[in-house]
Amino acid sequence: MSRQSETKKRTAKSDPIYRNRSVSMFINHILKDGEKSLAHKILYRAMKQIKRKTKKNPLSVLRQAVYRVTPNVAVKSRRVGGSNYQVPVEVKPARGKALAIRWIVGASRNRSGRSMASKSSYELIDAARNTGSAIRKKEETHKMAEANKAFAHLR
């Protein structure tokens, strides 16, 4: 067993324009091959498109989207007696937020369209309206947890 002390939880630094940690987390999830300036451009263009399309504050749309996609429960594989069970577990707020952002970015990438900025803007707007692939992913996860409720005692 390690003798070192437990590592502290690191929080994302807020981004320079919106001064928001969620935006910073989004940028870090969009990031590919270390091109952070490109990730910044993509998200800020998406935010401008959201403002133009919805006539609302893009930060509130992003917050609403993340809130709507955040799962309450998830399933975790647990091996008991030679067989694997999908055990439903509650999701902590920080993990839920990270999952929501990951699902939104993944759904944006899988969406058909030209630029990542437009795909991201459409996915964020859809998630804020409670539709879209990311919402479907959350509902799938909840259904899976509901179906495996019988194994909740295996935690």
Curated annotation (Swiss-Prot):
Q: Does the keyword Thylakoid apply?
A: no
Instruction: Return the Gene3D superfamilies for the record.
Output: Ribosomal protein S7 domain (1.10.455.10)
HAMAP family, sorted: Ribosomal_uS7_B
Does the keyword Nucleus belong to this entry? no
Q: What is this protein called in UniProt?
A: Small ribosomal subunit protein uS7cz/uS7cy
Compartments (UniProt record): Plastid, Chloroplast
Alphabetical keyword list: Chloroplast, Plastid, Ribonucleoprotein, Ribosomal protein, RNA-binding, rRNA-binding
Q: Which NCBIfam families match?
A: rpsG_bact
The UniProt entry lists the main location of this chain as: plastid
Q: Which organism is it from?
A: Psilotum nudum (Whisk fern)
Protein's job = One of the primary rRNA binding proteins, it binds directly to 16S rRNA where it nucleates assembly of the head domain of the 30S subunit.
Q: Which InterPro entries match?
A: Ribosomal_uS7, Ribosomal_uS7_bac/org-type, Ribosomal_uS7_dom, Ribosomal_uS7_dom_sf
Q: Which GO terms describe its molecular function?
A: rRNA binding; structural constituent of ribosome
Q: Which family does it belong to?
A: Belongs to the universal ribosomal protein uS7 family.
